């Protein structure tokens, strides 16, 4: 058991607390972290966004062996409503488990990290599998594979829906490219490279097993056997340049030029018409228009800068923002899986446990979300880590319990 005192905290904006490394691991490779109950002021006093509410949320970052693990804490109560907004950390137990496994992948490490926290209101368990390789033959430096266990918005229990995220960084850890690929919901056993299902199709398919042990298969594989084991990940790496993906990447000015133009890199997975790595943005069914506020395409047009997105079909996108949530030259990541926005709450898109999308509201031109207590933002570490918290619009609570990438 390890007790971390608040004197070790490094208070940061948006309620982030950095906790020193956990060194005590018991014989079962388990470590428990208890945070004491001293009052900590973690939100900016000048913020007026919290005066109308009596609850708050806290991101706690645990640093262990140079890896950063970011988790959302349960909901807290303020000690004085609207009075400088301190709140009490009330002995929140965090359980940290780490297990290392041996596999037969050449030059690759494999480990599992399980994170649990005790929240009577929203019990959950999150498991992350992380693959790492020093260098890939394509010239990239590492590749991070993220499985996430996604909760249904109407249930407190997780549904095991494996999904894939590839993060490519250079030797200094700077993000080069992040590719998010949703599991094919309709045709998990297809080997056809021209998969034309229009609903959440992906050219990387997963087995439909309910277990997080689900093994990767790809649309260009000759078999969808569940026994591919480590070879499937090797296949994924070798096939990465030729995967049946259409990736449109457009670099725009890092500096904020208007309220609706904050994107640095946009990477989109073509769900309807794969064109074998054609990077030209010429697909009528999947046209990424990053600078036009008028979204007029009929099918799967993802306009990331339009607050009135009228898409009829879903699209997988990643938006990497510089200078939006903070001005530290790091990358903030927003993931949009489904563009069917809630008509009543266009700021918050939740679709059966999928990711959340934030529209770019910045009415006071301070480069920060105006609703960052309700749309409790993404906080990144080193351009690699993201956190999706509860989306609270008009007192509608949706428990996201998102897990996070880990920076090696």
From Swiss-Prot:
Start-end of Low complexity biased regions: 187-206
Region (Disordered): 184-206, 254-317
Domain of life, source organism: Eukaryota
Entry protein name: Uncharacterized protein DDB_G0267764
Organism: Dictyostelium discoideum (Social amoeba)
């Amino acid at each position: 058991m390890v007790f971390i005192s608040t004197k070790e905290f490094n208070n940061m904006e948006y309620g982030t607390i950095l906790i020193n490394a956990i060194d005590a691991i018991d014989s079962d490779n388990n470590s428990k972290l208890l945070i004491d109950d001293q009052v900590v002021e973690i939100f900016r006093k000048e913020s007026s966004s919290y005066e109308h509410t009596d609850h708050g949320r806290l991101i706690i970052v645990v640093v262990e062996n140079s890896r950063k693990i970011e988790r959302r804490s349960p909901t807290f109560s303020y000690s004085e409503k609207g009075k400088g907004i301190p709140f009490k950390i009330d002995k929140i137990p965090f359980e940290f488990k780490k297990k290392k496994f041996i596999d037969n992948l050449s030059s690759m490490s494999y480990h599992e990290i399980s994170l649990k926290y005790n929240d009577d209101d929203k019990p959950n368990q999150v498991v992350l599998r992380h693959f790492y390789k020093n260098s890939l033959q394509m010239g990239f430096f590492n590749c991070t594979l993220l499985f996430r266990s996604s909760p249904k918005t109407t249930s407190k229990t997780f549904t095991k829906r494996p999904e894939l995220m590839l993060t490519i960084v250079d030797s200094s850890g700077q993000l080069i490219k992040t590719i998010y690929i949703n599991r094919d919901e309709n045709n998990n056993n297809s080997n056809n490279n021209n998969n034309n299902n229009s609903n959440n199709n992906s050219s990387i398919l997963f087995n439909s097993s309910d277990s997080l042990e689900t093994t990767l298969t790809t649309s260009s594989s000759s078999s969808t056997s569940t026994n591919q084991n480590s070879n499937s990940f090797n296949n994924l790496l070798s096939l990465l340049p030729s995967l049946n993906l259409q990736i449109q990447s457009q670099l725009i000015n890092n500096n904020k030029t208007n309220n609706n133009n904050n994107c640095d890199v946009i990477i989109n997975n073509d769900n309807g018409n794969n064109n074998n790595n054609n990077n030209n943005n010429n697909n009528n069914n999947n046209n990424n228009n990053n600078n036009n506020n008028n979204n007029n395409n009929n099918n799967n047009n993802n306009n990331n800068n339009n607050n009135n997105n009228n898409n009829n079909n879903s699209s997988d996108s990643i938006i990497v923002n510089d200078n939006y949530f903070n001005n530290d030259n790091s990358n903030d990541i927003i993931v949009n899986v489904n563009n069917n926005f809630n008509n009543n709450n266009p700021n918050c898109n939740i679709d059966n446990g999928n990711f959340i999308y934030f529209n770019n509201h910045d009415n006071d031109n301070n480069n920060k979300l105006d609703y960052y207590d309700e749309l409790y933002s993404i906080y990144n570490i080193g351009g690699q880590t993201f956190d999706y918290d509860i989306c609270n619009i008009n007192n509608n609570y949706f428990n996201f319990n998102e897990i996070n990438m880990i920076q090696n």
